[in-house]
């Protein structure tokens, strides 16, 4: 049975790099949110500075996810799937903007629950250094990233079972570690949770 694994974390934690490496190791389909579809492209424009209501952005993420989930379910028939961001990003990023959790959960009700979530943590100052060369997006401010980091831990520790992955959460701190060190930690933790993930 193929598995659906999600990578989450604040901006600059290294999740895109690690998600790609793990997907390659597991011979999995790599995917990401926002997607590169029409809705995902609109979201990227807004994140780069275009204006819209925060509720509109939340609804766009949810709509993009409808398309994404459809593709994930197709891909799972053939291989494991590894996603760089998923519904958890919507919950913590949009709650950091003051959108009620109930609203976010309702508009994402159809989202498929993954088998495992890998949360990459990092020191906030190191994350900001890693992001220095990138184009800034609306969420890439230290105060917002701090709220988002707290939001992830609040989500993991909540008793709400909505979107609770079958094999739970893996938390890996990437601060002051090489890409290889982090990769090895993640891979070992995944195998520990799902021993038959590598055939």
Curated annotation (Swiss-Prot):
Pfam families in the record: Thymidylate_kin
Stretches of the chain forming a coiled coil according to its record: none
Family matches, as InterPro entries: P-loop_NTPase (IPR027417), Thymidylate_kin-like_dom (IPR039430), Thymidylate_kin_CS (IPR018095), Thymidylate_kinase (IPR018094)
Gene designation per UniProt: tmk
Catalyzed reactions per annotation: dTMP + ATP = dTDP + ADP
Family: Belongs to the thymidylate kinase family.
Claim: Transport is one of the keywords in the record: no
Any one of the GO BP annotations: dTTP biosynthetic process
An example Gene Ontology molecular-function term: ATP binding
Signal peptide: none
Name of the protein: Probable thymidylate kinase
């Amino acid at each position: 049975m193929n598995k659906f694994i999600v990578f989450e974390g604040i901006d600059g934690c290294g999740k895109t790099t690690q998600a790609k490496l793990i997907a390659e190791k597991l011979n999995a389909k790599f995917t990401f949110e926002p997607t590169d579809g029409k809705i995902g492209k609109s979201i990227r424009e807004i994140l780069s500075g275009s204006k819209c209501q925060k509720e509109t952005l939340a609804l766009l993420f949810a709509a993009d996810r409808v398309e994404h989930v459809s593709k994930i379910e197709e891909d799972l028939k053939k291989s494991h799937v590894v996603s760089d961001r998923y519904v958890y990003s919507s919950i913590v990023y949009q709650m950091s903007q003051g959108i009620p959790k109930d609203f976010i959960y309702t508009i994402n009700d159809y989202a498929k629950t993954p088998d495992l979530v890998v949360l990459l943590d990092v020191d906030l100052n190191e994350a900001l250094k890693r992001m220095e060369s990138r184009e800034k997006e609306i969420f890439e401010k230290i105060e917002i990233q701090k709220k988002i980091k707290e939001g992830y831990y609040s989500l993991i520790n909540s008793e709400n079972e909505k979107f609770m992955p079958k094999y739970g959460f893996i938390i890996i701190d990437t601060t002051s570690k090489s890409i290889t060190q982090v990769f090895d930690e993640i891979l070992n933790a995944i195998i520990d949770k799902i021993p038959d993930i590598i055939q």
